[in-house]
């Protein structure tokens, strides 16, 4: 291939089956705290060669999709058709790229190296698929074992499958609708396209049965991370402060570009720290006029959503407010309840404390308020 073609990913997530259990289609079941679909989206979206990720969903799955991939920047989902081929055609029509990688949502564990191999293989073929050589003995039979089937040259074909978009779209449109294809490579070959085999990966196994999800959960064993946030704001003229999302009357106000809620700022940094996502200033720079006077609850909600997008689960947060005045004690319960509501936690998962510096330092001189927060979050081990 010449030049640098644009590359998009197309995730087929239109299935309606619930035989894997869980009460929802398998692409929306959660493993490691994150929907199967979200794992697939993230694996493709973080690859530097892929410019966009388009998801095809089933009719009536809009809410499930929104919940699964919330917090991510994606094009609107496309609604698929009655068959997988119909869904792929709908998705291909919505994609604007030279090359497309078509992936089954039920394969959440996609190594970047597989994507690299697929893209490279298109230099010498019309399409490329990842596959693993069959290692087990194959045999015919029902209740009784029949004859063995020679396994030489047999492969288990996986996804994603890579093609030039125009080629695979033409192949799908030319396919006999009376027949149902098992994958896109079958459609491509029937249209005369060459399809290369690249090395697949055992982690790309498709999730189908309840036992598959049990194995995936073991793979996604959660680990605990703890991070700290700290913030300071000085006093200025005013008649009250915002602390932990609660308005408290006072003879002064806190100075800051936003509403200067020092408690929520510290807590936001703590949450961002658990997923190594920088600090509040990198997401909401004080030089940006959009955040002038902004409600800091928005900042905390953003950090919460980023943690969720990473598959994280917030277990506990601890907040210490350091000041001589105003007195925090009378407002402690309200602050705790407000933070719990913002993070979707119970009151028992939020600790709010207050202390002074015994009249030492800037807080002791009543020049401002400091806050320190600690967040404990479970995240997937991979």
UniProtKB/Swiss-Prot annotation:
Keywords of the record: Isoprene biosynthesis, Lyase, Metal-binding, Multifunctional enzyme, Nucleotidyltransferase, Transferase
Names of required cofactors: a divalent metal cation
Enzyme Commission designation: 2.7.7.60, 4.6.1.12
Transferase in keyword set: yes
Region (2-C-methyl-D-erythritol 4-phosphate cytidylyltransferase): 1-225
Sites annotated Transition state stabilizer: 19, 26, 257, 356
Pathway: Isoprenoid biosynthesis; isopentenyl diphosphate biosynthesis via DXP pathway; isopentenyl diphosphate from 1-deoxy-D-xylulose 5-phosphate: step 2/6; Isoprenoid biosynthesis; isopentenyl diphosphate biosynthesis via DXP pathway; isopentenyl diphosphate from 1-deoxy-D-xylulose 5-phosphate: step 4/6
Catalytic activity from the UniProt record: 2-C-methyl-D-erythritol 4-phosphate + CTP + H(+) = 4-CDP-2-C-methyl-D-erythritol + diphosphate; 4-CDP-2-C-methyl-D-erythritol 2-phosphate = 2-C-methyl-D-erythritol 2,4-cyclic diphosphate + CMP
Binding site residues for 4-CDP-2-C-methyl-D-erythritol 2-phosphate: 231-233, 257-258, 279-281, 355-358, 362, 365
Residues annotated as binding a divalent metal cation: 231, 233, 265
Protein name per Swiss-Prot or TrEMBL: Bifunctional enzyme IspD/IspF
Family per similarity comment: In the N-terminal section; belongs to the IspD/TarI cytidylyltransferase family. IspD subfamily.
GO molecular function: 2-C-methyl-D-erythritol 2,4-cyclodiphosphate synthase activity; 2-C-methyl-D-erythritol 4-phosphate cytidylyltransferase activity; metal ion binding
Native species: Rhizorhabdus wittichii (strain DSM 6014 / CCUG 31198 / JCM 15750 / NBRC 105917 / EY 4224 / RW1) (Sphingomonas wittichii)
Region (2-C-methyl-D-erythritol 2,4-cyclodiphosphate synthase): 225-382
Any GO BP annotation: terpenoid biosynthetic process
Physiological role: Bifunctional enzyme that catalyzes the formation of 4-diphosphocytidyl-2-C-methyl-D-erythritol from CTP and 2-C-methyl-D-erythritol 4-phosphate (MEP) (IspD), and catalyzes the conversion of 4-diphosphocytidyl-2-C-methyl-D-erythritol 2-phosphate (CDP-ME2P) to 2-C-methyl-D-erythritol 2,4-cyclodiphosphate (ME-CPP) with a corresponding release of cytidine 5-monophosphate (CMP) (IspF).
Gene3D superfamilies: 2-C-methyl-D-erythritol 2,4-cyclodiphosphate synthase, Spore Coat Polysaccharide Biosynthesis Protein SpsA, Chain A
Positions MEP for the nucleophilic attack, annotated site positions: 151, 206
NCBIfam families in the record: ispD, ispF, PRK09382.1
HAMAP family in the record: IspD (MF_00108), IspDF (MF_01520), IspF (MF_00107)
């Amino acid at each position: 291939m010449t030049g640098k073609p644009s590359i998009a990913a197309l995730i087929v997530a239109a299935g309606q089956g619930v035989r894997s259990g869980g009460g929802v289609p398998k692409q929306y079941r959660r493993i490691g705290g994150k929907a199967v679909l979200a794992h697939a989206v993230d694996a493709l979206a973080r690859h530097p060669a892929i410019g966009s990720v388009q998801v095809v969903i089933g009719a009536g799955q809009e809410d499930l999709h929104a919940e699964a991939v919330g917090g991510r920047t994606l094009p609107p989902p496309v609604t698929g058709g009655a068959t997988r081929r119909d869904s792929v055609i709908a998705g291909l029509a919505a994609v604007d790229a030279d090359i497309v990688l078509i992936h089954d949502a039920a394969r959440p564990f996609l190594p970047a190296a597989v994507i690299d191999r697929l893209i490279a293989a298109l230099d010498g073929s019309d399409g490329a698929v990842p596959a693993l050589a069959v290692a087990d003995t194959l045999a015919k039979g029902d209740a009784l074992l029949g004859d063995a089937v020679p396994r030489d040259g047999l492969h288990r074909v996986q996804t994603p499958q890579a093609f030039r978009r125009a080629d695979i779209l033409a192949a799908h449109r030319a396919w006999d609708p009376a027949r149902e294809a098992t994958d896109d490579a079958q459609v491509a070959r029937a249209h005369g396209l060459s399809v290369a085999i690249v090395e697949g990966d055992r982690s790309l196994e498709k999730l189908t049965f309840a036992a598959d999800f049990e194995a995936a959960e073991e793979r996604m064993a959660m680990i605990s991370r703890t991070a700290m946030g700290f913030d300071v704001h000085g006093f200025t003229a005013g008649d009250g402060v915002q602390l932990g999302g609660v308005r408290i009357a006072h003879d002064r106000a806190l100075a800051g570009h936003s509403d200067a809620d020092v408690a929520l700022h510290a807590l936001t940094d703590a949450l961002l720290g658990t997923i190594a996502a920088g600090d509040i200033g990198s997401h909401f720079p004080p030089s940006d006029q959009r955040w002038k006077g902004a409600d800091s609850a928005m900042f905390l909600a953003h950090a919460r959503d980023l943690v969720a997008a990473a598959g994280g689960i917030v277990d506990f947060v601890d907040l210490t407010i350091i000041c001589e005045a105003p007195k925090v004690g009378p407002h402690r319960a309200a602050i705790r309840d407000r933070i719990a509501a913002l993070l979707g936690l119970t009151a028992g998962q939020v600790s709010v404390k207050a202390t002074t510096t015994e009249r030492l330092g800037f807080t002791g001189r009543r020049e401002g308020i400091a806050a320190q927060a600690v967040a404990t979050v479970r995240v997937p081990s991979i």
